């Protein structure tokens, strides 16, 4: 069972096992989307996810569509997950971070406080987004992105280590990062170099 105290749960919402939901969270209520016309849609929360005070997670827009938050996530106070977002497993959203509609956050992502993620943006697995970042384009896996607008500033070495990624793989990722972001090569040339070196 999950612990839910003085929070609002909308219809067609599923809460996984051993979740903790703190006061004044709103989960599965109607989306803040002018396209929504009252259709039956869903909000699904995985197991062992912690949802802190004043978090809002909207259900989806579109008949039969869903908003989903995975297992073992931590959504700190005042975070927002908009309609049709898909949040993977082991994701941390720091205080007041917000996902606009249809955003995708893959596994083991950390999003800093007050960061804003634009609609339809995808953040790749094991990435880290800095606090107050304005994310308007997709963020590749394994990197750190920060700024307004956010740009890739480095490899998320600490996150990769914590995720149990082997040292050999981390070394290859570091080399690939240098080729893509630091060499000055065009993308096609960078791909050629990686095929030669890795």
Labelled PLM ranges:
Residues 39-56, 64-80, 92-101, 107-112, ...:
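C-terminal segments of enzyme domains that contribute to small-molecule binding surfaces
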Residues 12, 33, 66-67, 84-85, ...:
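A short, glycine- and basic residue-enriched loop/turn
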Residues 9-11, 41:
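Extracellular beta-strand-rich solenoid/capping regions of secreted or surface-exposed proteins
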Residues 145:
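Divalent-metal (often Zn2+) His-rich catalytic cores of metallo-beta-lactamase-fold enzymes
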